Amino acid sequence: MVKIAVIGAGVVGLSTALQVKQNFPFCSVTVVAEKFNTETTSDGAGGLFRPNFLTLSANPLESIKQWSQDTFSHFNNLFNSPEASDCGIALMSGFLLSNKEKLDMIEDISLGQSKMTAEQIAKMGFDCKHVTKVLTYTMECRRYMPWLTSKFLSLGGSMHHHRLKSLEELVGVYDVVVNCSGLGAKDLVPDPLVYPVKGQLIQVEAPWVKHFYFFEDDTYVIPNINRTSLGGIRIKNDYSTEVDPEISKSIWQRCTSRIPSLQKAKVLWEWAGLRPHRDPIRIEQDVMNFPKGTLKVVHNYGHGANGVSLSWGTAKHATRLVRQFLENDPELRSKL
């Protein structure tokens, strides 16, 4: 039997593990990770499907479009299925607001968008020049990640709690490894192009907020099913995972000044974490040589703040690369 390991249990790792198991049901597929569920960076995702093309500029546009479209199609299928209530997806309309930069999404990866006129912007009380109304999805990761895990395990996948110090540990144990280690890839590969971007948000109870708001200065308000996320920040090469009270104060001030109805919202909890960024995102095959032997690796990491928006699409891409490894190696092909 072919043995495949997926390193990492964030939204990218779990999406990849599920697709690999779905495509290769007779292979043994194991998720190997140090952190699971609420311990992962994905737990702090705002969850809005909105690929940020400004932070993805190092990637080929056609790749970004394909990853985005594949993820959007997956979310669309989930929303129109009985799984919707369990997986955390919601259909959401909202506003992209800016003075300088265009924050529009590509039209064919949203359910619709339209520019607001200056008169409409004034009536809404928005203090900006450009506003685009968008219909898209939000995904609540505290529901989605357990759902992905459950689906993966139901197909016969397995989980292994382990902190890897080197990929060499997997030589001779697994036939193919999919590396979705996020920021861990900086030391595990090692890859000097990976760096942390600190994010911080406040989760509040505000059931009266029914639309998302995304501003060009990384300020956002994103309602999910049971809570609303207020953010945010983007600090490169900051390794602190502690909630900074001054940053929280800034987030609260920015969000409540623009959406005054949030001023009496109940704070549920605060979160800070490190988003794993790389220019470009790394999705490719790699045959790594170690003293113990060689290891077939498919890399899939470096998504930064685009983990949720690109997760299913990059997982699909990585799964194709796994298939190439299996089909092009006579020994592995004979085990299928």
UniProtKB/Swiss-Prot annotation:
Cofactor(s) needed by this chain: FAD
One of the record's GO molecular function terms: D-aspartate oxidase activity
Tagged with keyword Oxidoreductase: yes
Catalytic activity, EC: 1.4.3.1
Subcellular location: Peroxisome matrix
GO BP, sorted A to Z: D-amino acid catabolic process
Catalysed reaction equations from the record: D-aspartate + O2 + H2O = oxaloacetate + H2O2 + NH4(+); D-glutamate + O2 + H2O = H2O2 + 2-oxoglutarate + NH4(+)
Residues engaged in binding FAD: E34, K35, T41, S42, G304, V308, S309
Main location as per UniProt: other
Motif Microbody targeting signal: where in chain: 334-336
Pfam families: DAO
GO cellular component, one term: peroxisomal matrix
Lineage: superkingdom: Eukaryota
InterPro entries associated with the record: D-amino_acid_oxidase_CS, DAO, FAD-dep_OxRdtase
Keyword match Methyltransferase: no
SUPFAM superfamilies: FAD-linked reductases, C-terminal domain (SSF54373), Nucleotide-binding domain (SSF51971)
Purpose of the protein: Selectively catalyzes the oxidative deamination of acidic amino acids. Suppresses the level of D-aspartate in the brain, an amino acid that can act as an agonist for glutamate receptors. Protects the organism from the toxicity of D-amino acids. May also function in the intestine.
Matches recorded under PANTHER family: D-AMINO ACID OXIDASE, RE49860P
Family: Belongs to the DAMOX/DASOX family.
Other comments on record: The enzyme is inactive in complex with 6-hydroxy-flavin adenine dinucleotide (6-OH-FAD); the complex is not physiologically relevant but an artifact of purification procedures.
Protein name per Swiss-Prot or TrEMBL: D-aspartate oxidase
Natural source organism: Octopus vulgaris
